[in-house]
Regions:
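Active/ligand-binding-proximal structured segments within catalytic/core domains
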Residues: 36-52, 76-127, 356, 360-361
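Functional cores that coordinate and move charged inorganic groups
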Residues: 89, 109-214
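Terminal appendage regions of diverse proteins
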Residues: 209-384
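Short, hydrophobic/aliphatic alpha-helical segments
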Residues: 21-37, 79-90, 175-187, 337-355, ...
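Short amphipathic
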Residues: 18-21, 156-159, 289-298
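Short flexible coil/turn linkers enriched for glycine and charged/polar residues
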Residues: 13, 25-27, 64-65, 75-77, ...
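Conserved nucleotide-binding/hydrolysis modules and their immediate coupling elements
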Residues: 1-79
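A generic structural motif
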Residues: 30-31, 64-73, 125-131, 331-332, ...
Length: 384
């Protein structure tokens, strides 16, 4: 049985312990100590890393009451070693874990949402809820959670006796038996084996970075503490850059983007009208009944499609339009009424390092090799 120093004081960074055993295992050595401050992976929280004497601690696991440290070099059974945690990593895990408890508690109190999944990953914490939530509900829960952070109240970790536990209202993902460790933080009470901060104020900030519907509920990406500060600072830097690019005053990004979006829609409509005019002019000049291959300068993929379809409708014959595209040529290939150009498209791609495809009546793609004259000769031979 390993004495768990982190359960008594989660701020222990350095300690001494006696090596109980050391066994070679794949990837290192399995070391058991009589006592440890290293937290083993579990409950969504990653394990601690650091050093035991001259050995690096690579991973920490538990199989009940015994905690095993995987090290890169062996230790000697019976020797006394000094343990040292990677403190910045542990402090980060504590900020994320305590922050998650506070936010989960707010979601539960306000909307009855259960936390059904939790993992401290990188760069964000993943939280899964049992029910769908709106953006407004998430914002409300985030605000309440940060109010609890600002209140800077104590975080209490304890193991109540069975009678006290029976009359205590607490959150838990599963039914528990035996000793149950509870963590009270920011008005929330939850069963938890992890390490936590001493006060809610040490969390600093809780920020929901993104959210999406997942299964029957929501999946949230959350940042707490330094991670939240870094995320907000990064978002603010992007926002400042957008203000400058749009020549928009501070605080007016949304109206500027709406103007940009409306202007883009107007330009797209104007471009479509011009491409229709071009398509009609090209169709007017086309010879009825004859396959056509022509160069259309300045047209995008949609423009090439419009011209090819207009000519085919006029001539009742297949037509291929080509124009500049990336490092080569872009093409749009329209079949005569009732025709199928898929085999021609396949052969064209094979001959000129092309990519693309489509339906029997129309195919579209790009060619990495071949000049317009070469492709034109190939197509006229294939379409005739």
């Amino acid at each position: 049985m390993t004495e768990k120093l982190y359960e008594v004081d989660s701020y222990v960074q350095n300690f001494t312990a006696q090596v109980v055993s050391c066994t070679p295992v794949p990837g290192g050595f399995a070391v058991v100590l009589d006592r440890t401050a290293f937290f083993p992976e579990g409950g969504g929280q990653p394990c601690d890393t650091g050093r035991l004497g001259g050995a690096r601690v690579l991973a920490v696991h538990t199989d009940g009451e015994t905690i095993t440290h995987t090290t890169d070099t062996p230790l000697t059974a019976g020797e006394t070693v000094d343990g040292c945690l990677d403190w910045p990593a542990r402090l980060d895990a504590m900020q994320q874990h305590t922050g998650e408890h506070i936010l989960s508690g707010a979601l539960h109190r306000l909307f009855g949402a259960e936390n059904v999944g939790f993992h401290i990953g990188s760069p964000y914490v993943r939280m899964d809820t049992s029910i769908p939530l709106t953006q407004e509900q998430l914002a409300q829960a985030e605000a309440e959670a940060n109010a609890a952070v600002r209140a800077d109240t104590p975080v209490h970790c304890w193991v109540p006796d069975p009678e006290t536990l029976a009359r205590t209202d607490y959150r838990s993902k599963k039914e528990l038996t035996g000793d149950v460790r509870l963590v009270e933080a920011g008005g929330d009470c939850c069963a938890c084996c992890g390490t936590h901060l001493a006060r809610t104020g040490e969390v600093g900030l809780i920020k929901i970075i993104s959210f999406a519907h997942y299964k029957s509920g929501m999946r949230l990406a959350v940042a707490c503490g330094q991670r939240a500060y870094d995320a907000v600072a990064g978002i603010w830097a992007d926002t400042e850059a957008a203000w400058r690019l749009l020549s928009s005053p501070v605080g007016s990004l949304t109206p500027a983007l709406e103007r940009l979006q409306n202007g883009e829609a107007a330009l797209k409509a104007r471009l479509a009208a011009l491409q229709n005019t071009l398509a009609a002019a090209c169709a007017e000049a086309a010879a009825p009944g004859a396959p056509a291959v022509l160069w259309v300068d300045g047209a995008d993929g949609d423009g090439l499609r419009r011209v090819a379809m207009a000519i085919t409708a006029k001539t009742n014959a297949p037509c291929c339009t080509l124009g500049p595209g990336g490092q080569g040529l872009a093409y749009a290939l329209a079949a005569a009424p009732g025709g199928d150009v898929r085999e021609t498209c396949k052969a064209l791609n094979a001959a000129y390092q092309g990519r693309g495809g489509g339906k029997p009546g129309f195919c579209q793609g790009s060619l990495a090799e071949g000049s317009f004259e070469q492709v034109k000769a190939f197509l006229l031979k294939s379409l005739t």
